[in-house]
Amino acid sequence: MNHLIISCIGPDKTGLVDTLSKVISKHQGNWQVSSLHHLSGFFAGVIEVAVASEKSESLISELKAINGLSCQIEVAEPDLPDVVSNLVLEITANDRAGIVQEVSSVIHHQNGNLIKLISSNDSAAHSGQDIFKAKAEIAIDDKSV
């Protein structure tokens, strides 16, 4: 069994997820984990698929041939559970360039691994000033805590 990490980007249009899921299903792949987004007119997605080793190459070829979608695919080992503590960090701040770099630098220097980052940009209710919001999931080795 192979685990494929599929990263796709292309102009958003209806039916892209249906197309991806049909191709994966055709090769008896099991869609396991995904994060799919519409960003400024583009579809961007990351999908983990488990598929039989003998079907991997044909699945990869067909995914790369989807019209209007650029897919990069890596074969990965499934995650083995490590002894880690997961922390959740929620950030709300006045928006400015460099916030993500500052946060990721602190996480890195504390031997943390940024597992997931979801961010958005909103307007403050009264002032209309740009507000940066983020929720980060961080894994820290229990030996480092």
Residue ranges and their predicted role:
Residues 1-145:
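A conserved regulatory-domain signal marking ACT and ACT-like small-molecule sensing domains
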